[in-house]
Regions:
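Gly/Pro- and small hydrophobic-enriched strand-loop and loop-to-helix capping segments
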Residues: 128-150, 185-200
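Long, low-complexity C-terminal extensions of enzymes
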Residues: 255-272, 277-326
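Contiguous mid-protein beta-loop-alpha structural module that forms a pocket-lining wall or clamp
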Residues: 153-214
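Hydrophobic/aromatic residues within transmembrane alpha-helices
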Residues: 56, 69, 124-125, 180-181, ...
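Amphipathic alpha-helical blocks and their helix-capping loop/short-beta junctions
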Residues: 192-277
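Glycine-rich beta-to-alpha active-site loop
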Residues: 102-146, 168-169, 173-174, 178
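Glycine- (often His-adjacent) and acidic-residue-rich active-site loop
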Residues: 58-97, 147
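Conserved CoA-thioester-binding segment of acyl-CoA-metabolizing enzymes
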Residues: 1-57
């Protein structure tokens, strides 16, 4: 299986559990067996007293996790047009249960979000209580390009971004860097890509029997101080006022038209975002508008319930299969 688990013992006998996604050729895309295995192991670690901290990471330099392994889902949907294949129902149920369990995990849960953190990878990162990004981090919910919609709890975290930024990112699938992630509260710490082993060694040196939160925070703060000089420039907060004005509209059709005015913009970041939308799925755009609006008033559990229903309905519609093919 493309997922490995290990336990490292610290100086005081406490153990750190590490789960490593290891499907480098697919940028560590999540398959159903990987999701189930991770859920089982995290549940076991949560109940094991000697496990004091858990880390999620991805193998390879390109990505932590670039999403779910959707090809098999699409094949199943094509084989059962207009229906919800059993594989799809099982996949989304397992993925969302895993994501929800991360949000409520009872121990320190560190996610190392280097490289591409897309779709399902964002679901893992946002569920952790210590979300780390690096200079190589590129975060996005790019479902506008495949006829799905931003799921894995994105209804929750996008709807809670400042102003209209969540709506904009959902409609365009635009990438954000490590600085953006910190600024928008989509990450907690910025470390260098090469500091992962230093972090692990630091965790193993902590005294997990007393003042754990203070010690852990001090470790992370010290590591971040070494990295902060390499933090990239912010991309999206400086453009927030413009985006808020652009998307101060009454419906998704007006939002679509407003974003398309950016196609002639000299700001290439905005121009590229508009191109993502025009080349994307109109159905996804309608779903994004509605999910962002509804999720503001939902609990996290309600959000995942809504997303499960949405995902099953997307499987019934040919837009998803066609979007992945294209």
């Amino acid at each position: 299986m493309n997922l490995h688990f290990e336990e490292l013992t610290g100086t005081d006998g406490a153990r750190i559990g590490i789960a490593t996604l290891d499907a480098e050729k697919s940028l560590n895309a999540l398959s159903l067996p990987m999701i189930n295995a991770m859920r089982d192991k995290l549940d076991a670690w949560a109940k094991e007293p000697q496990i004091v901290c858990v880390m999620l990471r991805g193998n390879g330099i390109k990505a932590f996790c670039a999403g779910g392994e959707v090809r098999s889902l699409v094949d199943a949907c094509r084989a059962h047009p207009g229906e919800v294949p059993t594989l799809a129902a099982n996949f989304f149920a397992a993925e969302y249960r895993l994501d929800f369990s991360l949000h409520t995990y009872p121990k320190p849960l560190i996610c190392w979000g280097h490289g591409y953190v897309l779709g399902g990878g964002m679901g893992l990162l946002q569920g952790a209580n210590i979300r780390i990004v690096t200079p190589s981090s590129r975060l996005a919910m790019p479902e506008i390009s495949i006829g799905l919609y931003p799921d894995v709890g994105a209804s929750w975290f996008l709807s809670r971004l400042p102003g209209k930024l969540g709506l904009f990112l959902g409609l365009t699938g635009a990438h954000i860097n490590g600085r953006d992630a910190i600024d928008l509260d989509l990450a907690d710490r910025f470390l260098l890509d090469e500091q992962q082993q230093e972090l692990i060694e630091g965790l193993l040196q902590l005294n997990w029997q007393e003042q754990t939160p203070m010690q852990l925070n001090s470790l992370l703060k010290a590591l971040q101080q070494k990295a902060v000089a390499q933090m990239p420039e912010a991309q999206w907060l400086p453009r927030r006022e413009q985006i808020d004005e652009l998307l101060d509209v009454s419906d998704v059709r007006c939002a679509w038209k407003a974003i398309l005015t950016l196609l002639d913009h000299t700001d290439m970041l905005l121009n590229r975002a508009a191109r993502n939308l025009i080349e994307g799925s109109p159905l996804t755009a309608h779903l994004v508008w509605e999910q962002i609006k509804r999720a503001r008033h939902m609990s996290l559990a309600q959000v995942f319930e809504m997303e499960y229903t949405l995902s099953l309905n997307c499987c019934r519609h040919p837009e998803f299969s066609e979007g992945v093919r294209a």
